[in-house]
Design a protein with these regions (language model features):
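Cytosolic, long alpha-helical scaffolding segments
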Residues: 1-217
C-alpha cells in the first residue's frame, strides 16, 4: 500500500509476471484443487471432518492463483514481445485462462461438497459416506489425466480423457441412483450434482486439450 485515506487505497503491484510462466501457475492451481477434491472424498470414506477444515482458505488461494493467471494473460496479450521472451505463445496464454477458470470452479464445488460432507458425517450417514468416498479415486485420476493432456497438447490423450469423463459421469449418476435416501437426502443430492459437475468440468479441460492439439497439428 503506497497511499491510503478514508475513501481510497492505492496499491503497487510488485509481482514480476516474467518469473513464472502461466503453465506453472496452472500446475499449482491444479495441485491445490486436486487436494481439495481428494480430501472431500477421503473425509467421507474415513468419516473425518478434520480433513475438511480450512477448505475455504484453500479456495481463497485457488482464487488468488486464478486472478494471477488472468492478470498475467492481460499483460502478455498486450505485449507480444514479452510473451515471446518467456517462450509462451498467445494461444497458450488464452488457454491458460480457460483452464484456470475451470479449475477455480472445481474448487468452488469442493468447498460446497465439504460443507455437505460434514453434514452427512455428523448425521452418522456411514453407508452413504462410504459410497460417496469410493468415487474419489476415479474423479481425481480423471482430473490428473485431463490436465496432463492439456499440458502436453496430447490429442490421443485428450480423446481418451473425453471418453473417460463420459464414463465417469455415467458411473456417478448410476452410483447415486442406487443410494438409499434417508433424512440426509438433501446433502446427498448436492453431492450428486457436484460430483457430476466435477466430471463435466474435467471433460471441458479435455476438450480444450483436444482443440489445442488440433490447432497445432
Amino acid at each position: 500500500i503506497v497511499e491510503e485515506d478514508e475513501n481510497r487505497i492505492v496499491m503497487k503491484d510488485l509481482m514480476d509476471i516474467t518469473e513464472v510462466v502461466p503453465q506453472k501457475n496452472i500446475r499449482r492451481e491444479h495441485l491445490l484443487v486436486k487436494r481439495m477434491v481428494s480430501d472431500v472424498f477421503q473425509a467421507a470414506s474415513d468419516m473425518d471432518t478434520e480433513r475438511l477444515e480450512g477448505m475455504a482458505d484453500r479456495d481463497t488461494e485457488v482464487d488468488r492463483i486464478h486472478w494471477m493467471v488472468q492478470r498475467q494473460s492481460r499483460i502478455l496479450l498486450k505485449d507480444i514481445g514479452l510473451s515471446a521472451g518467456m517462450g509462451v505463445d498467445l494461444r497458450t496464454v488464452t488457454g491458460c485462462v480457460s483452464v484456470s477458470k475451470t479449475l477455480e470452479r472445481i474448487g468452488d464445488h469442493a468447498v460446497l461438497m465439504a460443507i455437505h460432507t460434514k453434514d452427512l458425517i455428523k448425521a452418522g450417514g456411514k453407508d452413504l459416506c462410504a459410497d460417496i468416498g469410493s468415487m474419489g479415486d476415479g474423479i481425481v485420476k480423471l482430473m490428473d489425466s485431463c490436465v496432463q493432456a492439456w499440458m502436453n497438447t496430447d490429442r490421443d490423450g485428450s480423446e481418451e480423457c473425453i471418453r473417460m469423463a463420459e464414463a465417469q459421469t455415467k458411473a456417478i449418476v448410476s452410483a447415486f441412483g442406487r443410494m438409499e435416501m434417508t433424512d440426509e437426502s438433501l446433502p446427498v443430492d448436492v453431492m450428486a450434482g457436484s460430483s457430476r459437475r466435477l466430471a463435466e468440468y474435467c471433460a471441458d479441460i479435455a476438450e480444450m486439450a483436444l482443440d489445442s492439439a488440433m490447432e497445432r497439428a
